[in-house]
Amino acid sequence: MILPCESFNGVPSGCLIIEMNWYSVLKASTAIFFPEKYSSSTSSLSKRSPISAPMINVDGEYLKIFAGRIKLMKAVILAAGLGTRLGGVPKPLVRVGGCEIILRTMKLLSPHVSEFIIVASRYADDIDAFLKDKGFNYKIVRHDRPEKGNGYSLLVAKNHVEDRFILTMGDHVYSQQFIEKAVRGEGVIADREPRFVDIGEATKIRVEDGRVAKIGKDLREFDCVDTGFFVLDDSIFEHAEKLRDREEIPLSEIVKLARLPVTYVDGELWMDVDTKEDVRRANRALVSAAVKGSGDGFISRKINRKISTRISAAIVNKVNPNQMTLISFLVGAFSALASFFSIPLAGLLYQFSSILDGCDGEIARASLKMSKKGGYVDSILDRFVDFLFLAIIALLYPKTATVAMFAIFGSVMVSYTSEKYKAEFGESIFGKFRVLNYIPGKRDERIFLIMIFCLLSAISLQWIFWMFLFVAAISLTRVVVTLLAVLVSK
């Protein structure tokens, strides 16, 4: 079903594109035009506020509506800086965490924004050329006075926005968690617990009665720091106009003059990128934040991630997720072939491939390049490497063939049970049954165990038999526990 509104990105920006039966369509239509009929807790229209659209629950599907359509704001991105501290490279086009700063910002804001107004000067053509094939609804507003400051850049956007709009900086990096909270705020979005910025360089704010009382980098007493993100309305230009004749118009002066309200988004990832060292710090922060919240085994949490995140941070701007998947696969396949020459060496390479296997996901999430296709290919290649490694060792030591068969079967079934659950129920089995996060037998744990036994095989080949036996035992036990958990669940 499509409820058409304004066009955005080739698709109506205010539309709902959902699969619903006609009964649900009727309920949705009734709710839009007769919201009082949906005032219960299970199917309700929330109170309208100036900063967030109401939500309605229709057969479990929350639909955001605003007078019959989704309410989206415009977003102004100030990108008129000279980029002098980054070797003349336009800051918005600097790649951080595998994604250009302005592209990251626009991707994360897209669900909330109808049009982007990008205020640029010297690098306007470069930014336009970069964005023209990205599918965004945007407008470049040019001016030739970047030396007048970011407050003047805001003034330049005056005739291109109305009502409420988002204002952000072209050299700031934000996480998705920050954006989702910030767009629901009002005025200055500030942070009382900044974890990723140099406080000495940050713009500090003194708050009184919930509004900006003082603002500046040199404040000795302050309550929070400015994140470079604002949710404003067009009344801000009345205050900006009072400063128009100044040689330089800092945005902070406009903020102080307007006594903007302050909304706190504390402790989330955000930072401004001014230097090459900032780029490196942002890479590390974005990759660390990209570690998936569930599904990792004990070895991944305690060992692998500590290494893989460092590797990912070093290469995130040079390698895409698919290339990283291929590299991990090739190392894994080579580890299997190395068994013909040295079992201990093969085990070490196998463990290294397991560490690298975490990098593609970290890079994909950090660079906002996640895809179902990439996850599918990665999963298939992992199964291939696991089978190849164990099969070659079983071939080299045929006396272990029977127990090796159970080890290979169990290894495949561990992955199959979790992937099949996700396919059938549409959610991660590790989120549903958290106890499975602590039962041994995940891929990272099996590979680490295999490495240990491969190293011990240098002392006695009898350890090869015990390797297969242990892998079979923990993997099949995990499969049985998983099945029981699903069967007894409601």
Curated annotation (Swiss-Prot):
GO process terms (BP): phospholipid biosynthetic process
Domain of life: Archaea
Annotated GO CC locations: membrane
A GO MF label: nucleotidyltransferase activity
Annotated residues for binding of Mg(2+): 180
MobA-like NTP transferase as annotated region, ranges: 72-290
Pfam families to which the protein is assigned, alphabetical: CDP-OH_P_transf, NTP_transf_3
Functional summary from the UniProt entry: Involved in biosynthesis of di-myo-inositol phosphate (DIP), a widespread organic solute in microorganisms adapted to hot environments. Catalyzes the condensation of CTP and L-myo-inositol-1-phosphate into CDP-L-myo-inositol, as well as the biosynthesis of di-myo-inositol-1,3'-phosphate-1'-phosphate (DIPP) from CDP-L-myo-inositol and L-myo-inositol-1-phosphate. The cytidylyltransferase is absolutely specific for CTP and L-myo-inositol-1-P.
Subunit structure and binding partners: Forms a mixture of monomers and dimers in solution, with prevalence of the monomeric form.
Protein name per UniProt: Bifunctional IPC transferase and DIPP synthase
Originating species: Archaeoglobus fulgidus (strain ATCC 49558 / DSM 4304 / JCM 9628 / NBRC 100126 / VC-16)
